[in-house]
Every structure is written in C-alpha cells, then in structure tokens.
C-alpha cells in the first residue's frame, strides 16, 4: 500500500495542484481545509476530505493519525491576521499550549513549532514545492513588455529591500517607486500591501522574494491572479520575484 499524504490546505488552487501531483506519484491523499473558502475542487480531488478550523490543532493532529498519514504538506493562503481579527480562529487547548510556549508570534516561530509537533508524531513535513516545480518560473522577463531602465532600477532596489524584511521575518513583499519604499508587507498580507503602496506611487514596482533562510516546508512566496488584480487596481507597473523560489 502506498504512502498517505496529508494536505493542510489554505485558500487558492495550490492545494488542488498538490493533491493531483501527489496522486500521480502514487500517494493516497487526505486534504484538511483549515479556513473557509478553500477551492471547491479540493474535496472532489482528494481521496479523503475534512474541514477542520485551523485553531483546532488537537483535532487536526488526531485526524492525521486516524487517517494513517505518513507525510504532510502545508499549502495555500492562510493570512496570519486570523490570529487577531477574531471570528475565524477558535483555538483549542493544544493550540493555546503551543502559542503560549512561543517567545514571539513571528511566522517562522509558529510554523517551526507546528513542524516540530508533527515530526514528534512521526509525520514527516514535506517540501511545499515537491509537486509544484512546474509553477516555479526561472530567470527572465515573463511579460510581453520589457521593464524601462527606471523600472529595472526599482526592481533591483525592491528585491534587495524585500530580502532584508524577509530576514527580519516581517514579510516577503515591498512596493517601491523611484528607489523609495511605498509599502512593506506585514500581517495584512501581500494584496493589502500592494493596494496601499500602489496608490501612494502610481507606476510602482512590487518585489516579492523568499526569505534569506527560507524553509521550503512552509510559507514559500506565491504570486497569483489575485496578486495581478491588486497590482492593476492600484496602478503598479510591474513585479519582480525570485527565480526558482516563487510559486
């Protein structure tokens, strides 16, 4: 019997892509939707589907064990603001214990604690990109229009600045115009950062990079249709992302 992969799923199409890729590779797939609004195809594609609130960590762990999950991947959009906005996150005692044990609420701190718990249970946490390598662009201009010399300068500057805020575990995205930072991504997420920064500097450049010490098991940078829509809405001129390290 083949291995069973647990897919801890956020919003977007990436969890569906992972499920499809895993099934082609011979895995039995168990998808757990952690937040409202996961893709409608997820339940159709996965061999087993559960919807469990992201705060019910004990129930999530129990379900993974009951389903015989050997490996797990965490994929899809889950914004950290749910920790603070109320209404979505309903933590159980296991979640509270984990959060109370942490020195801070940085993304990497929270995710590393969850990874450690899963590994202690004998469940290997898989590289997010394993079944998504065809979605990782290589170096080069992806659009029909080439950047202007001024846009190239902003792209180089923005890329360097995004790396710096990533190193501080603040976010992965900055919006720049004329080598000045219009917006920095924090807890609000990429789209809100783009909307805020683009409106401050029309024709601005978005830069999104992996963190200098990026752990491929979680929080790989992603650029999707919603990213493009936010750029169009706010009047941004282009985006630079990290080749081979962006979904």
Regions found by a protein language model. Give the residues of each.
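N-terminal glycine-rich phosphate/adenylate-binding segment common to multiple enzyme folds
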Residues: 57-131
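Feature captures the catalytic cores and cofactor-binding loops of soluble hydro-lyases/lyases
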Residues: 34-62, 66-67, 87-99, 191-247
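Short, glycine-rich nucleotide/cofactor-binding loops
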Residues: 2-13, 184, 215-218, 245-246
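Short beta-strand segments
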Residues: 8, 33, 74-76, 176-177, ...
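N-terminal basic/disordered segments at the start of proteins
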Residues: 3-34
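Conserved mixed alpha/beta catalytic, RNA-binding, or beta-rich assembly cores of soluble enzyme
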Residues: 22, 51, 104-108, 124-229, ...
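Short glycine-/acidic-enriched loop or helix-start segments at secondary-structure transitions
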Residues: 17-18, 41, 83-85
């Amino acid at each position: 019997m083949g291995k069973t992969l647990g897919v801890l799923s956020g919003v977007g199409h990436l969890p569906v892509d992972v499920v499809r890729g895993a099934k082609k590779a011979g895995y039995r797939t168990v998808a757990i939707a952690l937040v409202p609004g996961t893709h409608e195809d997820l339940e159709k594609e996965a061999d087993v589907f559960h919807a469990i609130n992201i705060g019910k960590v004990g129930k999530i762990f129990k379900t993974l064990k009951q389903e015989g999950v050997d490996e797990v991947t965490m994929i899809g959009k889950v914004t950290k603001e749910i920790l603070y906005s109320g209404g979505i996150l309903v933590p159980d005692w296991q979640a509270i214990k984990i959060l109370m044990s942490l020195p801070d609420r940085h993304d990497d701190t929270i995710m590393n604690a969850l990874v450690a718990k899963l590994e202690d249970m004998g469940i290997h946490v898989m590289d997010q990109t394993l079944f998504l390598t065809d979605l990782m662009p290589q170096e080069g201009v992806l659009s029909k229009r080439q950047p202007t010399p001024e846009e190239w300068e902003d792209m180089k500057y923005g890329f360097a600045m995004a790396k710096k805020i990533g190193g501080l575990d603040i976010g992965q995205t900055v919006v720049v115009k004329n080598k000045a930072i219009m917006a920095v991504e924090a807890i609000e997420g990429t789209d809100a950062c783009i909307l805020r920064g683009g409106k401050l500097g029309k024709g601005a450049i978005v830069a999104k990079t992996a963190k200098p010490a990026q752990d491929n098991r979680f929080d790989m940078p992603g650029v999707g249709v919603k990213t493009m829509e936010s750029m169009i809405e706010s009047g941004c001129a282009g985006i630079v992302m990290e080749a081979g390290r962006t979904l």
